[in-house]
Structures are given as C-alpha cells and as structure tokens.
Amino acid sequence: MMGMEIRRKHFPDTIRFHNPGLRRHRTSEISCHQIEEFVSISLTGTHCALDCKHCGTNVLRGMNDLSRSSKSLFELCSELAEQGARGILISGGSDRKGKVPILPHLPDLIRIRRELGLIIRVHPGLPDEETSAGLAELDIDGAMVDII
C-alpha cells in the first residue's frame, strides 16, 4: 500500500491547525476566538534554557505563568473553566535537551481531562519516551511542534 493510501485509510482529508491566541489573526481559513476560550499556560514562566533566536522567550511572555502561581495546574484550569475556557495549551521553556517539563504535571492533566473536559493541546518540545507515553494515555487533542 502506498503512503497516501495508508494516510487516507486512517486519517480524514482535513488538517486542523491551532492558533494559540498569542497573535490575533482573521482570514477566510482562520477565525478568531476569544482569548479566554482557549488559554495558553507556561509551566516554566519565561524561563527557557535554549533561548532560541526564533522565539527568544517572547512567546512565553504572553502565556499564563504557572511557575509564579501557588495553585496547581488543576486548580488554575478549574478557575479558567469556570470563567468560560474550553481548552488549554500547555507549553513552557525547554531544558537543555529541548524538553518542556510536562511529565510532573501529567496527574493534573489527567484530572483536567476527566473532571473538567477541557480540550488539551501541548507543546512538549522534544519529549522523552515516558512523557510521550503519558501524553498518549492522556489522549491529548493535539501537539504543537516547532518548525524552524
């Protein structure tokens, strides 16, 4: 079976892209949403060990900073859901290996999925096998990757 036939057998013909709300866009293909509906959360605040030129931690500055909060990720998301949020993007700065520290937050993410029903998208950087397995168990709605 050829590659395109395999893809068509297992996936629809549409691709859904996520515009995380850090910049406002409106085109015929992209509709704006209220920023409060889909909230971006940085697990590391503005800290990133890589500080790459394409970002320079600027993207992290527009996110809710979990690292400065006394709340758990679940508590923060509970409040956001009460305020009308329908989904979250979990991101943050990378460590020296390019990994965003999502693994310690997987128990909260599982609770968020089960108890709050929020859409969960992640920007994991370059996740290790354990993080990847946890995200698969969580059944995330999408993953964001850097294309440089």
Where are these regions (language model features)?
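N-terminal [4Fe-4S]-dependent radical SAM core
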Residues: 1-49, 53, 57-64
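Core AdoMet radical
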Residues: 57-76, 80-148
